Swiss-Prot record:
It holds the Pfam family SNN_transmemb. GO terms for cellular component: cytoplasm; membrane; mitochondrial outer membrane. The gene is SNN. This is Stannin. GO terms for biological process: response to toxic substance. Monomer. Keywords: Membrane, Mitochondrion, Mitochondrion outer membrane, Phosphoprotein, Transmembrane, Transmembrane helix.
Length: 88
């Protein structure tokens, strides 16, 4: 004689509680899956859209390249006076 033998509906209640727990776990997993899927979609859209405050990624890359550009031009200007044309 165990404690659970006193009521015939105890097994039914246990099954219902287990089903509710499985449904809640399934809803949690489904919610996380949908959330991660939406994050991936929004990340791919963010790469093409505005990053913030009216700035996009393309001008940021252009600023990096333009920052390298004057350094190359300065090196070219420094090398030109030292070339054979000045001493020749």
């Amino acid at each position: 004689m165990s404690i659970m033998d006193h009521s015939p509906t105890t097994g039914v209640v246990t099954v219902i509680v287990i089903l509710i727990a499985i449904a809640a776990l399934g809803a949690l997993i489904l919610g996380c899956w949908c959330y991660l899927r939406l994050q991936r979609i929004s990340q791919s859209e963010d790469e093409e859209s505005i990053v913030g405050d009216g700035e996009t990624k393309e001008p940021f890359l252009l600023v990096q390249y333009s920052a390298k550009g004057p350094c190359v031009e300065r090196k070219a200007k420094l090398m030109t006076p030292n070339g054979p044309e000045v001493h020749g």
